[in-house]
A protein has these predicted regions:
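N-terminal cap/lid segment of alpha/beta-hydrolase-fold proteins
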Residues: 1-25
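Catalytic histidine-centered segment of alpha/beta-hydrolase-like enzymes
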Residues: 236-247
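Alpha/beta-hydrolase active-site loop
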Residues: 45, 81-102
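Short beta-strand/loop motif that positions the catalytic acidic residue
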Residues: 196, 202-204, 208
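The serine-hydrolase catalytic nucleophile loop
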Residues: 39-51
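Beta-strand-enriched cores of mature, soluble protein domains
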Residues: 261-386
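Hydrolase active-site cap/lid region
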Residues: 128-175
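Conserved alpha/beta-hydrolase
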Residues: 50-75
Length: 386
C-alpha cells in the first residue's frame, strides 16, 4: 500500500508544496527520489514515477516550483514572471534540505529525476551538489533553454531581442518575465552539466519537437566516458505515452540498480502468422528482423526470428521471442548471440543469452539480466540491462 501525504517547506519566505510517497513505515532508511516537473506543468506530472518507485522501496517526493506550476492545495508561492531555472534550482535545493530532516530518508542515496525543464534543473542542481547526489535521471531535459533565449523564443513564444518586453505569454498560457531571459542568455549548459561526476541516465525522444535530439547527444558527450547511459526512444516525442512508459520505468529501475545497458536491439515486424486457435487458447507468431549497433556488439538478426505469443482464456498474451544475431563484438571478433526473451512470474522480461564470443559471455556472466521493451510504430527497441 502506497501512502501519500502533502508536505511543505520554505525557500526564504516562499512556501514550497508537494507530495511524499512511500510504501508505509519502515525500520530502515529509504533511498530518496526527488522528481521535478516540466515547464507549465505541476507535480502531478511526476506521480507515475513516484508511485512506481515508492512501491520498490524508495521515499519519493514531487513538488511544485515557486511560480512554476501547481494549482489548489499544492500550489507553491511565487509568480511565474519571477521564475527561471536558477530560482528553480533554489527550490530543489530547499526540498533536498527538507529531506535531510526526515528520519526515514537515506540522504547518502539521493536520486534527482526530472522531466523537460525539471530535468535541466535537476542536472544543474546535481552539478552544484556533486557527490551528495547518487544518481541523476534526466528525461527530455530542456537543455535548449539558453539557445531559445538567444533566439528570442523562450517558452515557445517569439519576442524582439532588441526590445525585450518585461513579460510575455507563452503558447501554453504561462506568463514569464524578462528576468528569465537575462538569467540564461549567456549560459553554456554543457559546461555546467559536466561538473557533475556521478551516475547519469539521459532519456530522449528521437522526434522531440521541443528539444531537438542534437541537444541530448551533445549532453551525453559532455560527460566522462562510461558515466552516462543514453537512451534514444525511437519515434519518441517530448514525453512518452502509456505504451512506452512502463518500460521507461524498467529502464530507470535497472539503471538505479547499478545495471548497465549491455545491448539494445532494434526490432522490425515482418509478418504475423496464426499458429493455433481453440475455444480457450490463441497462439500467433510475430516474425521480425532488426539489428544492434552498440559499443559491445554490432550485428543483424538472422532470418527465422519469431515472437510466439500465447493467450489462454481471457488472460493476456504471454510473449516468448527466440532469435539469433550475427555480427562482431567489441574486440572485433565475429560471433553469434542467441536470445530467448520471455516474461517471468514477477512480470519482468528475463532473457537467457548465449554466445560463442568469449567477450560477450564474460559481459553477461553472473548478471541478472532484465529486458525493457519500448514499442514504436512497426516494431520495438529491446534494451538488455545487466
Amino acid at each position: 500500500m502506497i501512502s501519500e501525504k502533502v508536505f511543505e517547506t520554505y525557500k526564504g519566505n516562499q512556501k514550497i508544496k508537494g507530495k511524499i510517497f512511500s510504501a508505509g513505515k519502515s525500520d530502515v532508511k529509504l533511498p530518496v527520489m526527488i522528481a521535478s516537473h516540466g515547464f507549465g506543468c505541476d507535480c502531478t506530472e511526476m506521480e507515475s514515477y513516484c508511485k512506481y518507485f515508492s512501491e520498490r522501496g524508495y521515499l519519493c517526493l514531487s513538488y511544485n516550483f515557486c511560480g512554476g506550476g501547481g494549482r489548489g492545495e499544492l500550489q507553491s508561492d511565487g509568480e511565474s514572471t519571477e521564475m527561471n531555472v536558477f530560482t528553480e534550482i533554489e527550490d530543489l535545493l530547499a526540498v533536498i534540505e527538507y529531506v535531510k530532516g526526515l528520519e526515514c530518508a537515506d540522504t547518502d542515496n539521493i536520486t534527482l529525476l526530472g522531466f523537460s525543464q525539471g530535468g535541466f534543473v535537476s542536472g544543474l542542481t546535481a552539478s552544484r551538489l556533486n557527490e551528495k547526489i547518487a544518481n541523476l535521471v534526466m528525461i527530455c531535459p530542456a537543455i535548449c533553454i539558453p539557445d531559445h533565449a538567444r533566439l528570442g523564443m523562450l517558452g515557445g513564444a517569439k519576442y524582439d531581442l532588441d526590445n525585450i518586453p518585461e513579460s510575455w505569454a507563452c503558447p501554453n498560457g504561462m506568463v514569464i518575465g524578462r528576468q528569465f531571459h537575462e538569467a540564461v542568455k549567456d549560459m553554456d549548459p554543457y559546461l555546467e552539466l559536466a561538473k557533475f561526476k556521478g551516475k547519469v541516465l539521459l532519456i530522449a525522444g528521437e522526434k522531440d519537437p521541443v528539444v531537438n535530439y542534437s541537444y541530448q547527444v551533445k549532453a551525453y558527450q559532455c560527460y566522462e566516458e562510461g558515466q552516462c547511459e543514453f537512451l534514444m526512444i525511437r519515434d519518441g516525442g517530448h514525453g512518452f505515452g502509456a505504451d512506452v512508459m512502463p518500460n521507461i520505468l524498467v529502464d530507470i529501475e535497472s539503471f538505479l540498480q547499478g545495471k548497465k545497458n549491455i545491448m539494445s536491439v532494434n526490432v522490425f515486424c515482418t509478418k504475423v502468422e496464426e499458429f493455433d486457435k481453440t475455444d480457450d487458447m490463441h497462439r500467433i507468431g510475430v516474425f521480425f528482423t532488426g539489428y544492434s549497433d552498440g559499443d559491445d556488439f554490432r550485428g543483424i538478426i538472422l532470418p527465422g526470428a519469431c515472437d510466439t505469443q500465447t493467450k489462454i482464456g481471457d488472460g493476456d498474451y504471454k510473449l516468448c521471442a527466440d532469435y539469433t544475431l550475427s555480427g562482431v563484438d567489441k574486440e572485433k571478433q565475429e560471433c553469434i548471440i542467441h536470445v530467448i526473451n520471455k516474461q517471468a512470474e514477477d512480470g519482468y522480461f528475463r532473457p537467457t543469452i548465449d554466445s560463442d564470443s568469449k567477450y560477450i559471455r564474460n559481459l553477461i556472466k553472473g548478471k541478472d539480466i532484465v529486458a525493457a521493451l519500448e514499442f514504436f510504430d512497426g516494431g520495438l527497441t529491446v534494451r538488455l540491462w545487466g
